[in-house]
Amino acid sequence: MYKRQIQNIIDSVGSKGAVKFLGKVYNNISLDITKSIILTSDVNTTLNGKLNTYVLNIKADDVLVKNLNINGNNGSGIVVNNVKNTVIENNNINNLLNQSNMDNYNSGITLLPGKGIALLNSKNTTVENNNIQYYYNGIYLNGAKYTSIQKNTITKNNFGVEFDKDASNTLINNNNIIENIGFNTMVMIEGPYGYGISMRHSGVNVTVTNNRINNNYMGVFIDAKNCSGIVITGNEISNSTIEGLTVNENYTYAPGAVLIVENNAIYNNAKGPSQIILGEVSANPNGIYGPGEWNDTLKLQLGPNWYGTNKYTTWGLNQTGPGTICPRIHTTLIPYNITCISPGKYEVTFYNNGSIASKLPDLTTYFVLNYNTDKEEVVEVVAHQGKATFEFSAKNYNETNNIIEGFSVFDPNRPKSVIYTYNVPESEIPK
């Protein structure tokens, strides 16, 4: 079936009707949706886009797009254009790329084309449970208001979610925003690509909660003027090439506004390679918090977070990398402690101001018994709601002088740093 035939079918369906694709694959597709309808499939239909344009252009209110494979062809997947009440759910939204350029795309040498989902002056849009990859923007907001972005996997784009001008009232919840592609080389200091979430041109009433924002060039980037109502809580932000979170030089806030960043696990960032490696979070020295490096009252104030360390360390000339904090920021550490449950078995508990840090996201840490000896044993621990249990094999204990050490990262390709040491009493050695 040709594009024109499909367009004619869509145009002939009454408002509030449905178009169900029955075929497996349709090629050279670029469709305009000008009435309130449902587009769906029960047979895993693939719509391969026309070269250098959109696959679907939604120009009517109350449109539902679900259960489709939507492949842009060096262009965009779905454009939502000046309408309201659009729902985009349970789709795979990919980009058909020139395979000869894949190495350049993955390294960031060549920028990716198109937008997976472009929200242009839209209102009340729901984007849920989609897989979006290999676009310049996974999700792009320009003039979009009251947008819900939940339960998506957004990966291998130049920007996972990007805020352009006049976007507001956005919920970004429970997404996997991972491996978004920047200049992962020694060429660039910071960006301008590869950000998990980029609030470059607007940041008004944005809630970022319970997401996994991992393995991006940078995790979260805030650079907009006159920001207000930004809340970043309960996220795992880890393994970024440079910082996990940056407040950049153009950032300003509206009168009375407070940037809330708390109960996140922001750790194991600044992994490189990059021209400059800093730490977990940063405030640009040329921005409004620049003087905070020398005046504590002028620092950016962040709430308590897990930074992959039990010791507050400000980065400096001789101290950068994972676990370090920008000197223009004041924050509070969420540390952990371990206690013995029974011989050989332990519980790790993270604490926020003396109470269990139950609002933390799930996070990974490591404990090593008798590190760097012939009885070394490594356990990977995933903490849930601020707690986890772990145990070591009895055969790896010495009769005396056993030590448990904690590491935020235990990767042969990354430097290791002990963040916790526990001398095991003889009463805790399993028999």
Q: Locations of the language-model features?
A:
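N-terminal extracellular ligand-recognition/capping segment immediately after the signal peptide
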Residues: 7, 16-38, 42-52, 287
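Short flexible loop/turn segments that cap and initiate beta-strands
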Residues: 350-385
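Parallel beta-helix/beta-solenoid
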Residues: 14, 33-35, 42, 51, ...
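Edge beta-strands of extracellular beta-sandwich domains
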Residues: 410-429
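Conserved small/polar residues in nucleotide/adenosyl-binding loops
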Residues: 1-5
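Right-handed parallel beta-helix/beta-spiral solenoid domain characteristic of secreted/periplasmic
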Residues: 37-79, 87-112
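Consensus "Asn ladder" position of solenoid repeat domains
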Residues: 68, 91, 130, 152, ...
